[in-house]
Structure formats: structure tokens, C-alpha cells
Amino acid sequence: MLSAIDAIVSRGGRVILPAFGLGRSQELLMLLAGQGYEVWLDGMGRDIARILQKHPGALRNVGGLNHALKQTRFVRHWRMREQALRGDVIVTTAGMLSGGPVMHYMQELRHDEKSALFLTGFQVPGTNGHQLLETGRMRMERDSESPAFRVDCEVAQFSLSGHAGHAQLLEFIRACDPERVILYHGDDRQPLADDLDCEVILPEEGVPIQLSSSS
């Protein structure tokens, strides 16, 4: 991903990195630290970073985060977003383009072919981010019924998964030795269900399931 960012910045463009507020935003800042970019942080990730700094015992690499934050410029009010747009990289919520400051930045940059939006997290089908990957168009408002507009800037997705893989999930579930497992989130749940030696429920969105404790 860093080489892709280099290419965009070298040609005079700006990079928007939509990110989940907790974890991914801070991870990206640490990845970008020391690379020579002018990095701005906006949205919920900014507020969470401040909270994490107050609780260093909850972090595995508090030094790395503090180092990254010292090199990061914070968007403290909406007027500063114009300053952020003159920088190199903007890390902002929401990670699936469901709202937040990223909407403002995309309004400004969506027709700038020198710039780019790089998605770094899973995009749930039906979300704005998933629609952008599939169609090249995205909504500029939170309302799911609002019209979708063409995006001309470069769009790409990079895998920085914060989730366990198939083998890790199997190991964890087997260690718990459950009677029943409910698999809800994921691209393809059936292969994992097939590898489990217990009752597996694959609920559909909007369909209630009834749970009863065994006697």
C-alpha cells in the first residue's frame, strides 16, 4: 500500500484512507509514520486516539502510537478540512463510507484523477464502500436511498485484515468446545461451518433466531 501512496503523492494527488475509528485508524498512522507524508487524522479515530493515550496500559505498542501521533496533524474543526485537503494523506472515518468526514473529502476529490481513495477494511455487501468497488459510484449522503455519483479518482482495496483467518477461528472455537455456534459475519460462512463438529446456525439478516439453554 505504501508504494501505491507514493505513486499518488508523487503525481500531485492526495490519498484518502477511510478507516474504522478503533484500531484501524491508529494502525494506519503507525504504518505511515516516518514515510515523509503530511498526514491528517479526522473523525472518530481522532477522538479514540486521544482516549488511548490516556490509557497506555491497554496498548501493546504505546511508544509506536505516540510517535505516530506526534507526526500527525489533527482536524480539530470543520474549517481545518480545507487545510487537510492540501496535505498528502487523510485518515478518516467511516471505514465503509457510511458517513462521517470521508463524505466531505470525497465530495472534493471524487473527480480528481490524480488522487485516490484506498479502502483498507472489509466492505459489507450493501454498504457504500461495497457499492463503490462494484460499480465505481458512491452515495454522498448517509441516506441509503440517496443517489450514487460517479467517482473518477483512483479506487483500490488493500487487505489489512484485523480478523482471524479460517484456521485461527477453528482453533479458537474448538478450544471453547461449544454445543452450538452462530456464524453471522463473513464472506463465505459455509466452509467454516462444514469444518465444525457442533451445531452451526447461519442466520440471515432480518430473520430472528430462537435460542434456548440446554438443561
Which role fits each region the language model picked out?
Residues 1-215:
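Acidic/His-rich, metal-assisted hydrolase cores and their charged scaffolds
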